[in-house]
Curated annotation (Swiss-Prot):
Gene Ontology molecular function: any one: metalloaminopeptidase activity
Record protein name field: Probable cytosol aminopeptidase
Coiled-coil annotated residue ranges, if any: none
Cofactor (UniProt): Mn(2+)
Family matches, as PANTHER family: CYTOSOL AMINOPEPTIDASE, LEUCINE AMINOPEPTIDASE-RELATED
Family per record: Belongs to the peptidase M17 family.
Source organism of the structure: Burkholderia mallei (strain ATCC 23344)
Pfam families cross-referenced by the UniProt entry: Peptidase_M17 (PF00883), Peptidase_M17_N (PF02789)
GO CC terms: cytoplasm
Record: active site: 286, 360
Length: 503
């Protein structure tokens, strides 16, 4: 799909190109109380009051989410007009804009429209310019067009008719909007990769499959990749990671993918993604109901790989390293048992009180490995705890960090990207719950504050650099009728790196 940007100041008579230019449809916004947006006023004048007459007749009331097509419109180059309800003008918000864009795309995708002129990006969204509107609209469109049909014998209907979108933006935002469009496409491509990896079944998306995906990203975008196999992992003495992997016939992989966009001496940001490609719980077996969704336990890895693809396509001037420890967590005669004690790469011994708290066991060795890159910051991403879902539900990703500056950057990025996160505590007092009579620490701390104690566990292996942990258990995928991976938190991570790169 092709996206282009054209500057237009509707209030100053510079809209002739939009009024006369050939297009299958032009999208206009209508507020409640029959108030037209700037673009709609110009179109109304060019069509001799058609838009006003339709509104006056009550065919559309401007309520948010309502749409109306006008066909065979004369006086303009577009053959039809799509009116989109925006709600109350004094309550118009970023969310309202996103909802309006979403319903507009849904309406258009149900037609044979090939080329559309989209004017909503110029709507007066508080604290936002039209370049933000372009990015949000492209992401909304790509979200609407995403389908996962790879595993069906007869894939669903093909690509939508819509092929080209022309965005009208404020002339002062023209350059920024072009950058925003490029970034939005790259971000959507990264999110689609993340969703595809998450939606694939565990018998397809194995640790080896993830490793091959990383190799393909490296080949396509000129990145450096190293994939460590069993013997190399053993040589590094990653006993914690290996204790989880040993119960599966699928060989573990330790993926290191490097993007160099800045000076060689510039310290990289390291992203660590949990890559449990299927989590049965091990000997501490999960209930059968809903276990199919444990294919999503690699969404941390998927989001890190998706972010790397997006960053490479954007060409950001920043160095980024992705580390993905990946394996399955399965019950077997040689699998971890409750009460087993394993030795991590750092040398700390861990009492495995619950084999279903395995994500932290593979991440801790990856966090130790990350030290060799002398990182500017390390962010691990994991579907780590059900407790985070109880605490935050499915809207906010859980954010943990003792570094206020890093936490602030991530929260700012989450707001800018529309990929919300919420900071949770990481007080030292919670560490007491991880005490063990027989090892340096236990892998669980009981039911109270389960997401916090999981983060506390990881913090013991991330003491030598600025570190943050993102618990995406509630945000990486959806259940029910809309079941599927969401692609989060790729927008948050990408925005964080955009900000770091100063792009």
């Amino acid at each position: 799909m092709d996206f282009s940007i054209k500057g237009c100041d509707w209030s100053k008579g510079t809209a002739n190109g939009f009024l006369t230019g050939k297009s299958d449809c032009i999208v206009l916004g209508v507020f409640e109380a029959q108030t037209l947006s700037g673009a709609a006023l110009d179109i109304d004048e060019a069509t001799k009051g058609l838009v006003s007459r339709v509104i006056k007749a009550g065919d559309i009331d401007g309520k948010l989410g309502k749409t109306l097509f006008l066909h065979e419109v004369s006086g303009i180059g577009a053959s039809r007009v799509l009116l989109v309800g925006l709600g109350r003008q004094d309550a118009f918000s970023q969310k309202a804009y996103g909802d309006a864009a979403k319903v507009a795309w849904r309406a258009l995708l149900g037609t044979k429209v090939v080329q559309v002129t989209f004017t909503l990006a110029q709507l007066p969204v508080p604290e936002r310019a039209s370049d933000w509107g372009v990015r949000a609209a492209i992401l909304a469109l790509r979200n609407e067009t995403y389908k996962f049909t790879q595993m069906k014998s007869k894939p669903d209907a093909g690509a939508p008719a819509l092929k080209r979108v022309v965005f009208s933006v404020d002339p002062a935002d023209d350059k920024a909007a072009k950058v925003a469009a490029k970034q939005a496409v790259a971000l959507a491509n990264g999110m689609d990769l993340t969703r595809d990896l998450g939606n694939l079944p565990g018998n397809v998306c194995t640790p080896t499959y993830l490793a091959n995906t990383a190799k393909k990203i490296a080949k396509d975008w000129g990145l450096k990749v190293d994939v460590l196999g069993l013997k190399q992992i053993q040589a590094l003495k990653m006993g914690s990671f290996l204790s989880v992997a040993k119960g599966s016939v699928e060989p573990p992989q330790f993926i290191v993918l490097q993007y160099r966009g800045a000076a060689a001496k510039a310290a990289p940001v390291v992203l660590v993604g949990k890559g449990i490609t299927f989590d049965s719980g091990g000997i501490s077996l999960k209930p059968g109901e809903g276990m199919d969704e444990m294919k999503y336990d690699m969404c941390g890895a998927g989001s890190v790989l998706g972010t790397m693809r997006a960053v490479a396509e954007m060409g950001l001037k920043v160095n980024v390293v992705a580390i993905v420890p990946t394996c399955e967590n399965m019950p077997a005669g040689n699998a971890n048992k409750p009460g087993d004690i394993v030795t991590s790469m750092k040398g700390l011994t861990i009492e495995v009180l619950n084999t279903d708290a395995e994500g932290r066991l593979i991440l801790c060795d990856a966090l130790t490995y990350a030290e060799r890159f002398k990182p500017a910051a390390v962010i691990d991403v994991a579907t780590l705890t059900g407790a985070c879902i109880i605490a935050l539900g499915h809207h906010n990703t859980g954010l943990f960090s003792k570094d206020d500056a890093l936490a602030g950057e991530l929260l700012d990025a989450s707001r800018e990207a529309g990929d919300p996160a919420w900071r949770l505590p990481l007080d030292d007092e919670y560490q007491d719950q991880l005490k063990s009579n027989f090892a340096d620490l236990a892998n669980i701390g009981g039911r109270p504050a389960g997401s916090v104690t999981a983060a506390c566990f990881l913090s013991r292996f991330a003491e030598n650099y600025p570190w943050a942990h993102l618990d995406i258990a509630g945000t990486a995928w959806k259940s029910g009728a809309a079941k599927g991976a969401t692609g989060r938190p790729v927008p948050l991570l990408a925005q964080f790196l955009i900000d770091r790169a100063g792009a």
